[in-house]
Design a protein with these regions (language model features):
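Extended, highly charged
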Residues: 1-219
């Protein structure tokens, strides 16, 4: 009712159209696509952080100054996440083991006609505990499931994930990683907060900061 969301039930193709519309509306409000071609039961939201005024409303910040103060406080006062037992976790109510093609259960998109494949850009990659020096790391990584249920993702040089890879590259020990979808907006924001390692060094608690940002522990 305040004009902060475009909600459409017009069919949109994840091949070029979703990202094309998003790009056309850069800097504006979020867009919720209710009718995704070839993906019944799926919805897609883009431009979630395209408008700083919408972001302020999303988190209850009065203005830009209030946002700066609240974010600074959250960075130095993380809230430990609340761990939910698997039997009680909503995300474990429906489990698909060994899927033949992971892309069937997500909405990968194609950005340009020059790309040979669809890309998953909405997954939030998570590494925690001893593999991140006792902390928690969230990040965006362009992902592709090229071989059914085997995926690859791009790691930016110097990023937190790059630090993890550098540490374990020659190790035979697998590094546990989860890729999460539909996470709270605070986690999505923290996933894009890397590369400033004076503020967020290796071993920091990004999930904890996300909890402080939203005013309650991430569950």
């Amino acid at each position: 009712t305040e004009g902060d969301l475009i909600d459409t039930d017009q069919e949109v193709d994840p091949d070029l159209e979703v990202v094309g519309l998003q790009k056309h509306l850069d800097g504006s409000c979020p867009i919720l696509f209710e009718n995704v071609k070839g993906k019944p039961g799926h919805r897609v939201i883009t431009n979630l952080f395209g408008d700083i005024n919408v972001i302020n409303k999303m988190f209850g910040w009065q203005d830009d100054t209030d946002r700066t103060k609240k974010l600074a406080y959250a960075l130095s006062h993380p809230l430990a996440p609340e761990v939910i037992d698997s039997k009680d976790a909503p995300v474990h109510q429906h489990i698909i083991e060994k899927p033949g093609d992971v892309n069937e259960y997500m909405v990968p998109v194609r950005h340009t006609e020059y790309e040979p494949e669809l890309t998953v850009g909405s997954g939030i990659r998570c590494v925690t505990g001893e593999h991140f020096d006792g902390g928690s790391d969230l990040g965006y990584n362009r992902m592709n499931f090229r071989w059914g249920n085997i995926g690859t993702f791009q790691i930016s040089p110097g990023s937190h994930m790059w630090q993890v890879v550098s540490r374990y590259y020659k190790s035979d020990e697998p590094v546990p990683i989860t890729v999460c979808f539909g996470v709270p907006p605070s986690c999505t924001m923290m996933a894009g907060a890397g590369f400033d390692y004076v503020i967020l060094p290796e071993g920091c608690d990004e999930i904890g900061v996300a909890g402080a940002m939203q005013g309650a522990p991430v569950r």
